[in-house]
């Protein structure tokens, strides 16, 4: 029988000092016989997806205490990728994932907590906490802050999101009135950005991994129903904690729930819903933390057989996360995958013995439950607010149309090709990724001359200066985990290509990554990265690059001998090899240099290569 970890600090005469300190936090005699459950909150006033979380940690804590546990809340950092975008602030985004993972580990292990509730929401916070959960392998449950409502303005016929504001800001044909209207309307409420961007993609994937409750990824931050997710998380964590420590039930541990099969389920969901390419990076990292042998090869295999069943902004202007929820949420997509034989349905979850049991209870198509139908009719109020649970609007009906609705059946899929693909070739020997759901099918096969730049900043300048022409393949290199360092997101270059009318006329290739808000022929995560000796560092302006999504290939039209000669020439540069030709006006702090020293390329999840420490 496992011993409560907290007994290390709460039992025995020699722990009198530790107990004295615990008492100073408010613990009573009876509390030393209860499980101590850490509540990792990520409240910050910097991030709209987290601005409403301040009181929610204590909401969960009170419910934990009602259920017989002792709750201890702490905070992690949270970076807003949208605010950090387009300047050197983005260098810190991906490294913050590892800092979050480490900080959760430090707090939980330093204080010998028995279990963990992760209150996350945005881009690197959910992945960082997921990495920590897999690393710690103690009972855990995730509950996110929820998605933002989509924006509306009389100057647009469609609902708005952050990407619309970015694109129109550099559209020379847009009036100042339009730009201001979009800016004021694109992000109307608290919550993670309203499309299937990285934050919402990751919160959806925690459902597929079995580590969060139904609705976690899709129920709006503003809706009153979301309060119940937080309360249930508090009750549920006490239940599964006691099952582990008092009944020796290891099936409730993260590594028993988020198995290889669960990671395959999460990736199948990601492909089916056309999620952010960042999710690939984060799933690979989390799998490594848990010792799960899930790799790019598995992602490639799944991408060839899982169809696209859901299309959400930025891949369409028609649907946002509020529409996904109305159509049955993540469970709705998983249920369609299950009916198509594309799911491992016997894996456990934190809320049901098996995933199949959870689908039977929560799928709007098959359950017949009025309570479930009411839950998924939770909708937007259209009132700007930064307050959680502040409205109780409901759609008059569900979207149960699996032929032409937001979520479709396998038989009526948006496309037989899934929403994500892994490409390989002489320019990306270890692979690169593209969000096919955001690429017009007319350019799935594309060939053009390389336009090589060695920083995102230069790419942005050249695009806005009109130097990039239709037919070009913009190559942005030395922006990988090591080369950036920090693997910046390229939302601005892709958005500016759109604003210049080049969204369907150019491709963009990088060893950096893309925001979940990116669409277009944007190929990222090129591995190995340039700074690690990848062939992308050998490409020259004018080289012809051939991209073939259906055949999963990407190549620069150079012979092996030509590439070898260029590699020899690069090696001859000595300590200047595999670095930008010209020094970049970029301030790289000591902490970023430390990150770069250990960072692996994207195909490994951009995790730290700890073998370098041996």
Curated annotation (Swiss-Prot):
- Binding residues for Mg(2+): 81, 123-124, 489
Family statement drawn from the similarity comment of this UniProt entry: Belongs to the IlvD/Edd family.
Q: What does this protein do?
A: Functions in the biosynthesis of branched-chain amino acids. Catalyzes the dehydration of (2R,3R)-2,3-dihydroxy-3-methylpentanoate (2,3-dihydroxy-3-methylvalerate) into 2-oxo-3-methylpentanoate (2-oxo-3-methylvalerate) and of (2R)-2,3-dihydroxy-3-methylbutanoate (2,3-dihydroxyisovalerate) into 2-oxo-3-methylbutanoate (2-oxoisovalerate), the penultimate precursor to L-isoleucine and L-valine, respectively.
Known partners and oligomeric status? Homodimer.
Mind telling me which PROSITE patterns this protein's record contains?
ILVD_EDD_1, ILVD_EDD_2
Q: Which organism is it from?
A: Cellvibrio japonicus (strain Ueda107)
Give the protein's cofactors: [2Fe-2S] cluster; Mg(2+)
Name the encoding gene, please.
Answer: ilvD
Q: Record's InterPro entries? A: Dihydro-acid_dehy_C, DihydroxyA_deHydtase, DiOHA_6PGluconate_deHydtase_CS, ILV_EDD_C, ILV_EDD_N, IlvD/EDD_N
Q: Name one GO molecular function term.
A: dihydroxy-acid dehydratase activity
Organism domain of life = Bacteria
Q: Which residues form the active site?
A: 515 (proton acceptor)
Q: Does the keyword NAD apply?
A: no
Q: Where N6-carboxylysine occurs, residue numbers?
A: 124
Query: What is an example of a Pfam family matching this protein?
Result: ILVD_EDD_N
Q: Which UniProt keywords apply?
A: 2Fe-2S, Amino-acid biosynthesis, Branched-chain amino acid biosynthesis, Iron, Iron-sulfur, Lyase, Magnesium, Metal-binding
Extract the HAMAP family matched here: IlvD
Listed binding positions for [2Fe-2S] cluster are 122, 193
Quote the Gene3D superfamilies the UniProt record gives.
IlvD/EDD C-terminal domain-like
Q: What is its EC number?
A: 4.2.1.9
Question: Which GO biological process categories is it annotated with?
Answer: isoleucine biosynthetic process; L-valine biosynthetic process
Specify the pathway.
Amino-acid biosynthesis; L-isoleucine biosynthesis; L-isoleucine from 2-oxobutanoate: step 3/4; Amino-acid biosynthesis; L-valine biosynthesis; L-valine from pyruvate: step 3/4
Which GO CC terms are listed, alphabetically? cytosol
Protein name in the entry: Dihydroxy-acid dehydratase
The free-text cofactor remark is: Binds 1 [2Fe-2S] cluster per subunit. This cluster acts as a Lewis acid cofactor.
User: What chemistry does it catalyse, as a reaction equation?
Assistant: (2R)-2,3-dihydroxy-3-methylbutanoate = 3-methyl-2-oxobutanoate + H2O; (2R,3R)-2,3-dihydroxy-3-methylpentanoate = (S)-3-methyl-2-oxopentanoate + H2O
Give the lineage.
Bacteria, Pseudomonadati, Pseudomonadota, Gammaproteobacteria, Cellvibrionales
């Amino acid at each position: 029988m496992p011993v409560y970890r907290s007994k290390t600090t709460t039992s025995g005469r020699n722990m009198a000092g530790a107990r004295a300190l615990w008492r100073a936090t408010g613990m009573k005699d009876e509390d030393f016989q209860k499980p101590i459950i850490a509540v990792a909150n990520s409240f910050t006033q910097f991030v709209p997806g987290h601005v409403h979380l301040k009181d929610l940690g204590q909401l969960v804590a009170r419910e934990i205490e009602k259920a017989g546990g002792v709750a201890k809340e702490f905070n992690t950092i949270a970076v807003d990728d949208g605010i950090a975008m387009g300047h050197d602030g983005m260098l810190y985004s991906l490294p913050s994932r590892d800092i979050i993972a480490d900080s959760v580990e430090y707090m939980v292990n330093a204080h010998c907590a028995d279990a963990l509730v992760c209150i996350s929401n945005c881009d690197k916070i959910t992945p960082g906490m997921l990495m920590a959960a897999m690393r710690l392998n103690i009972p855990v449950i995730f509950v996110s802050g929820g998605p933002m409502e989509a924006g509306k303005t009389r100057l647009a016929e469609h609902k708005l999101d952050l990407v619309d504001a970015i694109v129109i800001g550099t559209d020379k044909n847009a009036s100042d009135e339009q730009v201001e209207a979009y800016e004021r309307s694109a992000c109307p409420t608290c919550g993670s950005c309203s499309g299937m961007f990285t934050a919402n993609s990751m919160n959806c994937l925690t459902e597929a991994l079995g580590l969060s409750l139904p609705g976690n990824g899709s129920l709006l931050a503003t809706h009153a129903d979301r309060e119940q997710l937080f309360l249930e998380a508090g009750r549920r964590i006490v239940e599964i904690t006691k099952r582990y420590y008092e009944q020796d039930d290891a099936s409730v541990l993260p590594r028993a729930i988020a198995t290889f099969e669960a990671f395959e389920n999460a990736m199948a969901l990601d492909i089916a819903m056309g999620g952010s390419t960042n999710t690939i990076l984060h799933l690979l990292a989390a799998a490594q933390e848990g010792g799960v042998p899930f790799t790019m090869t598995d992602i490639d295999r799944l991408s060839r057989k899982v169809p696209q069943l859901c299309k959400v902004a930025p891949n369409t202007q028609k649907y946002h996360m509020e529409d996904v929820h109305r159509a049955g949420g993540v469970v709705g997509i998983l249920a369609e995958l299950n009916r198509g034989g594309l799911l491992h349905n016997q894996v456990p979850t934190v809320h049901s013995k098996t995933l199949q049991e959870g689908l039977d209870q929560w799928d709007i198509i098959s359950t017949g439950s009025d309570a479930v139908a009411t839950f998924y009719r939770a909708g937007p109020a259209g009132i700007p607010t930064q307050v959680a649970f502040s409205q109780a609007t409901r759609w008059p009906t569900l979207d149960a149309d699996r032929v032409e609705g937001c979520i479709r059946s396998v038989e009526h899929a948006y496309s037989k090709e899934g929403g994500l693909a892994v490409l390989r070739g002489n320019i990306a020997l270890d692979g690169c990724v593209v969000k096919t759901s955001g690429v017009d099918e007319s350019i799935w096969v594309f060939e053009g001359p390389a336009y090589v730049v060695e920083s995102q900043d230069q790419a942005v300048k050249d695009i806005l200066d009109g130097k990039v022409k239709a037919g070009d393949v913009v190559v942005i290199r030395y922006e990988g985990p090591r080369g950036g360092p920090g693997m910046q997101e390229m939302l601005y270059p892709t958005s500016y290509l759109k604003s210049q009318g080049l969204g369907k006329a150019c491709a963009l290739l990088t060893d950096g990554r893309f925001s979940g808000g990116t669409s277009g022929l944007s190929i990222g995560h090129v591995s190995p990265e340039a700074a690690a000796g990848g062939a992308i560092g050998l490409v020259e302006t004018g080289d012809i690059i051939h991209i073939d999504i259906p055949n999963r290939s990407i190549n620069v039209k150079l012979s092996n001998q030509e590439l070898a000669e260029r590699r020899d020439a690069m090696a001859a540069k000595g300590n200047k090899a595999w670095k930008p030709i010209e020094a970049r006006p970029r301030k790289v702090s000591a902490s970023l240099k430390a990150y770069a020293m250990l960072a692996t390329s994207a195909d490994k999840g951009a995790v730290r290569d700890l073998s370098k420490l041996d």
